[in-house]
């Protein structure tokens, strides 16, 4: 991990198209401005971790799930 020190108003460039800038320092909180192309997905770490967990949970299925879906789409005998 690269660790850098920045002062208020200073920035960091990532690649050719992302700039991070320190916009406010208040108490124990730092506000960071991010200038990046719209096609770049930017998430807070805790949100990204929740997205990953929910995607993993949604991708899990059991044979009971398959049976339930099958019973919904299979023609029922009369």
Swiss-Prot record:
A Pfam family: CsrA
Assembly with partners or alone: Homodimer; the beta-strands of each monomer intercalate to form a hydrophobic core, while the alpha-helices form wings that extend away from the core.
Any Gene Ontology CC annotation: cytosol
Annotated source species: Desulfotalea psychrophila (strain LSv54 / DSM 12343)
Assigned protein family: Belongs to the CsrA/RsmA family.
Localization terms from the record: Cytoplasm
Keywords assigned: Bacterial flagellum biogenesis, Cytoplasm, Repressor, RNA-binding, Translation regulation
SUPFAM superfamilies linked: CsrA-like
Function of the protein: A translational regulator that binds mRNA to regulate translation initiation and/or mRNA stability. Usually binds in the 5'-UTR at or near the Shine-Dalgarno sequence preventing ribosome-binding, thus repressing translation. Its main target seems to be the major flagellin gene, while its function is anatagonized by FliW.
GO BP of this protein: bacterial-type flagellum organization; mRNA catabolic process; negative regulation of translational initiation; regulation of bacterial-type flagellum assembly; regulation of carbohydrate metabolic process
Protein name: Translational regulator CsrA
InterPro entries, alphabetized: CsrA (IPR003751), CsrA_sf (IPR036107)
GO function term, MF aspect, one: mRNA 5'-UTR binding
Superkingdom, taxonomy of origin: Bacteria
């Amino acid at each position: 991990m690269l660790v850098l020190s920045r002062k208020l108003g200073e920035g960091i460039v990532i690649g050719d198209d992302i700039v991070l800038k320190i916009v406010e320092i208040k108490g124990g909180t730092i506000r960071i401005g991010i200038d990046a192309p719209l096609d770049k997905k930017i998430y807070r770490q805790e949100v990204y971790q929740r997205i990953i967990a929910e995607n993993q949970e949604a991708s899990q299925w059991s044979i009971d799930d398959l049976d339930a879906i099958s019973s919904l789409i299979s023609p029922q005998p009369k």
